[in-house]
Structures are given as structure tokens and as C-alpha cells.
């Protein structure tokens, strides 16, 4: 006969299943990178899923194309003749008000689209939602191309196309973040910014190619190409998998497993897929237990939702307040002011720097993490603006503004503009989207992202509309305003933005719910990967058998 006696030494059963804060801090950041669920493979094994993410990210190309082309349109002779105002000397010019409205109103449309059309992703799925918003975008392009000499018709078309792009800006990063492997999520979401920069660059090139014409080819051809981009985007959506989190939400479990397996290049029976699927289901059940999400929930402190919403709004706002669109929207105009003979060529150079630099971002965002990149970017861009503004104010016109500008000073300004764009392209440009795409729990994700990205669009409108007035008033001193915003952004990131590198979306949510201090978040370990360490309060189970 075998008998056993069990004695339990310890005072707290709870302590046996959780770590104390002290024990948690002892764990090393390297442990965080060790995946206990789906093992990492060589990056070449993920080419397929990365290609799919690139297709989804093509929505960013559409936005970039608009940014790159509109900066040239407002300087094209036919565009000014049709939509400008007749001057005393017989020429046509766009007034500051009309220029600001035509450039900036696109962002208002984007904000409206993000807040209203982003909801389609929750109702019909991310893929179908993206197809729907692309259709809205096409309607806006048709209105713009059909405009003949009524600037307000073109204005309305930009609002409608902006609504489509706003929906894309919410749904595209969302879908990428939900289908990409967690250790490549930062890189894959950064594809969206890569496509934006490609669109800006090719938009500049197209403007350069059409400026030699004297009729509506100058601006209607670039607009007509938008139909090709829309068709390519829709075809791409047919090929990509649906979000596994959306599929679980709709009860399509087998499809969700296949989507996870496809993203991680394993079979549906792989233990890692089973573990991640079970985690998604468990989190979904918890969300269902508390009912459907409402707009009011975004302003609740429960689950640290409100601090995350505020953080997303501020990060997206600060991306605009870096001053990036000061160059992208008005680059052609700016370099006319510094004496460049062909400012269209200069814009192409800036677009090329922007596009090439973003490839660096694809590497560093998951190599060095979100916080370090944002901090470095804020500091370097602030330095660039100090030099750009100081040279522009004190050295560009040594004999007065009514005299020729200094070529050497103009060259210095262009060089530091390139340094600024390099710093922006590898840090704030992609990472602002990465942050908002991985910060929110699924039940409020689309609403929270819509508000955050909407803030980006609103600031884009304000900068686009008021820049002509501000530069006319204070000139290149405008750069000091952006420098101040960049200094603020440095301290905001340090005190309020958590490091999410190497975490699943569910683990990111867990970290925020535990209210980890952002400057300590780099060493935080998810509960599923913690190794309990013996303490005086840990129960000790002794089994005697005979």
C-alpha cells in the first residue's frame, strides 16, 4: 500500500502564480526577445507574408502620390490659369487662401474618412473595408479630373478623395499589424510609410515630366494615373489573408488558424499557432463578456484605454508638427524662394532621399525599438531646423530680400533639409503609424486609431492652410516653431511612450494594463514568459511517499 503525505509551507497561494514587482525587474530584456511560442526563422522564410503586407501598404502610396503631385500642381501654369485669380499684369495666381484650402482640405477629408469609413473594417472585415474606401477615393478623383475652371469643384473632389485615403490610413496599418509575425510587425507596418515616400517621389517625378506641357496634361495625367493605383490596390486585396483577430471575432476559427499559419510560415497544427490562436480567442471572450465597445469607452480609464488614446493622438499630432509637410507640401515653393532655377528638380532630390531613407527604417524599427528611434529622430530634426531657420533668416539675403539670394546659403539650407528628411523618414514617419497600430485592444482599435490618425489629418490641414500666411509674415523663422515642437516631442516620448518591440498585440495590451512606466518598459516581460523565482512568500510543496 502506498500512502502520501503532503505539507504546504507558505503563506500565500496567490504568490505561487505571480511574480512580485521586484522579481519582474530582475528579468533581462534578452528574455523578452526569446519567443516561447512560434520560433523565429530566417527572414527569407517570411518573404511571402512580407510581400502580402507590402500589397496592403500600397494604400500609403495613394496618399503619398497626392502629397507629391499637389505640391507641383499649385505651381503649374495651366492649373493656376484655371483655378487662380487674374492679376493686374494679366497673369493668374492662386491666392494664399485658395492655395491653403486646396492643399489643406484633403486632410479634412482624410479625418472625416478615418472617423466614419474606418468602421467598415469592423463590419465587413479589413479587406472588404479597404476595397470600399478605395471606391470612395476613385469618386473623388473623377470629380477633380472633371473640374474645368471652378476651383470649388476641384476643392470638393479633394474632400471626397481625402475621405477614401483617411479610411485607408486606418485600415491598412490595422490589417498589417494583425497578420504580420510579431517580431517583424514594426518592419511590416513601416511598409506603409515606405509606400508613402515612394508615392511622393514618383509624384514629384511625374510633375517634372508634365511641366513642359502648357495645357491640362500638366495635372490631369497625374490624376488619371490614380485609377491605375486604385485597381492595383483592389487586386492586391483579393490575394491577402483576412485578419485572424477579425475572423475570431466573427467565429470563423478555421480561417483564423489558416491566416495565422500563413503569416508565420508554419502549419495550422504548429504548437505556436495553437498557442497564439488560443490567446486571441481568450482575449476575445474577455472582450465579449463586457459587451460591445462604445465611443464612451475610449474616454474610460479602465484598462488604461484613455491614456493610450491620448498618447496616440499626441504622437500622430507630433508627427505633423515635426514640420515634415512644410517641405512636402510647399517644397517647390520653398526652393523657388532660395533661388533655385528649377525647384521641381530639387523636389525630386528630396523625394529620392525620403524614399531611400525609409529602407533604413525597415531595419532599425525592430532592431533598436520604437522609443530609441523616436528620441533620436526628435533630437536630430530639431538640430536640422535650427540650422535651416538660422541660415534662412540671417544669411540667405545678405543685401536684403529685394536683392539676389546667396547661393551658398541656399545650398546649406537644401543640405540640412535633406538631413531633416533622412531623420524623419527613418524615425517619426513610420513609427508614428507603428505605435498606433499596435497599442489598442481589438474591441476599440478602429475607433481609437480613427481618432489618433484624425488628429494627424487635422494638423495636416492646419499646416497646409496656414503655412502660406505664416511664411509670408515671418519667413524662415517658421522653422523655430517646428524646432520647439520637436523639443517637446523628445520629452513626451521619454515620459509617455512604451517600448513594444518583440511583443504580440495581446502582450502590448497586458503591458499597458499593468501600467508599466514607459522608461522601464524596455525590460518588461509578459506573464506568459516569466520564470518564477523562489522568494520567502513562494509556497513550498513537499511530498513524502512510501
UniProtKB/Swiss-Prot annotation:
One of its GO terms (biological process) is carbohydrate transport. Residues 66-100, 149-158, 207-220, 342-347, 394-415, 475 are extracellular. Keywords: Glycoprotein, Membrane, Repeat, Sugar transport, Transmembrane, Transmembrane helix, Transport. Residues 1-44, 122-127, 180-185, 242-324, 366-372, 437-453, 497-546 are cytoplasmic. SUPFAM superfamilies: MFS general substrate transporter. It is found in: Membrane. GO terms for molecular function: carbohydrate:proton symporter activity; D-glucose transmembrane transporter activity; fructose transmembrane transporter activity; galactose transmembrane transporter activity; mannose transmembrane transporter activity. InterPro entries: MFS_dom (IPR020846), MFS_sugar_transport-like (IPR005828), MFS_Sugar_Transporters (IPR050360), MFS_trans_sf (IPR036259), Sugar/inositol_transpt (IPR003663), Sugar_transporter_CS (IPR005829). Probable glucose transporter. This is Hexose transporter HXT10. It comes from Saccharomyces cerevisiae (strain ATCC 204508 / S288c) (Baker's yeast).
Amino acid at each position: 500500500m502506498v500512502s502520501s503525505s503532503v505539507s504546504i509551507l507558505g503563506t500565500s497561494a496567490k504568490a505561487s502564480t505571480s511574480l512580485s514587482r521586484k522579481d519582474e525587474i530582475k528579468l533581462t530584456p534578452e528574455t523578452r526577445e526569446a519567443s516561447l511560442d512560434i520560433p523565429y526563422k530566417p527572414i527569407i522564410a517570411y518573404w511571402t507574408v512580407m510581400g502580402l503586407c507590402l500589397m496592403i501598404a500600397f494604400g500609403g502610396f495613394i496618399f503619398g502620390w497626392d502629397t507629391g503631385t499637389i505640391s507641383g500642381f499649385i505651381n503649374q501654369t495651366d492649373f493656376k490659369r484655371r483655378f487662380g485669380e487674374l492679376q493686374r499684369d494679366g497673369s493668374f495666381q492662386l491666392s494664399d487662401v485658395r492655395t491653403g484650402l486646396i492643399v489643406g482640405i484633403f486632410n479634412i477629408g482624410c479625418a472625416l474618412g478615418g472617423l466614419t469609413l474606418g468602421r467598415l473594417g469592423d463590419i465587413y472585415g479589413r479587406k472588404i473595408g479597404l476595397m470600399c474606401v478605395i471606391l470612395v477615393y476613385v469618386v473623388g478623383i473623377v470629380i477633380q479630373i472633371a473640374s474645368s475652371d471652378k476651383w470649388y469643384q476641384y476643392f470638393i473632389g479633394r474632400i471626397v478623395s481625402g475621405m477614401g485615403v483617411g479610411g485607408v490610413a486606418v485600415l491598412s496599418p490595422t490589417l498589417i499589424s494583425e497578420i504580420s509575425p510579431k517580431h517583424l510587425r514594426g518592419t511590416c507596418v513601416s511598409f506603409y510609410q515606405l509606400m508613402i515616400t515612394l508615392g511622393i517621389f514618383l509624384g514629384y517625378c511625374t510633375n517634372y515630366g508634365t511641366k513642359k506641357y502648357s495645357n491640362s496634361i500638366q495635372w490631369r495625367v497625374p490624376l488619371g494615373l490614380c485609377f491605375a493605383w486604385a485597381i492595383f490596390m483592389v487586386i492586391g486585396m483579393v490575394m491577402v489573408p483576412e485578419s485572424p483577430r477579425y475572423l475570431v471575432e466573427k467565429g470563423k476559427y478555421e480561417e483564423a488558424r489558416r491566416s495565422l499559419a500563413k503569416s508565420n510560415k508554419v502549419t495550422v497544427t504548429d504548437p505556436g499557432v495553437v498557442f497564439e490562436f488560443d490567446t486571441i480567442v481568450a482575449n476575445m471572450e474577455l472582450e465579449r463578456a463586457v459587451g460591445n465597445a462604445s465611443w464612451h469607452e475610449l474616454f474610460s480609464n479602465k484598462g488604461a484605454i484613455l491614456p493610450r488614446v491620448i498618447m496616440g493622438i499626441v504622437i500622430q499630432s507630433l508627427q505633423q508638427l515635426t514640420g515634415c509637410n512644410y517641405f512636402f507640401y510647399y517644397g517647390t515653393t520653398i526652393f523657388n524662394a532660395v533661388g533655385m532655377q528649377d525647384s521641381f528638380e530639387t523636389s525630386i532630390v528630396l523625394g529620392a532621399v525620403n524614399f531611400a531613407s525609409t529602407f533604413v527604417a525597415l531595419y532599425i524599427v525592430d532592431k533598436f525599438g520604437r522609443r530609441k528611434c523616436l528620441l533620436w529622430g526628435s533630437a536630430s530634426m530639431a538640430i536640422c531646423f535650427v540650422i535651416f531657420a538660422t541660415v534662412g533668416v540671417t544669411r540667405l539675403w545678405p543685401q536684403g530680400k529685394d536683392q539676389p539670394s546667396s547661393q551658398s546659403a541656399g545650398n546649406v539650407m537644401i543640405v540640412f533639409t535633406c538631413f531633416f528628411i533622412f531623420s524623419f523618414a527613418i524615425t517619426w514617419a513610420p513609427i508614428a503609424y507603428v505605435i498606433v497600430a499596435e497599442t489598442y485592444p481589438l474591441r476599440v482599435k478602429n475607433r481609437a486609431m480613427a481618432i489618433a490618425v484624425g488628429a494627424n489629418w487635422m494638423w495636416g490641414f492646419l499646416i497646409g492652410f496656414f503655412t502660406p500666411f505664416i511664411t509670408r509674415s515671418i519667413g524662415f523663422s517658421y522653422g523655430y516653431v517646428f524646432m520647439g515642437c520637436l523639443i517637446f516631442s523628445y520629452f513626451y516620448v521619454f515620459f509617455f511612450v512604451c517600448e513594444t518591440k518583440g511583443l504580440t498585440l495581446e502582450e502590448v495590451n497586458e503591458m499597458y494594463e499593468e501600467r508599466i512606466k514607459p522608461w522601464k518598459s524596455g525590460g518588461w516581460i509578459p506573464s506568459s514568459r516569466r520564470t518564477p523565482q523562489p522568494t520567502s512568500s513562494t509556497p513550498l510543496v513537499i511530498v513524502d511517499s512510501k
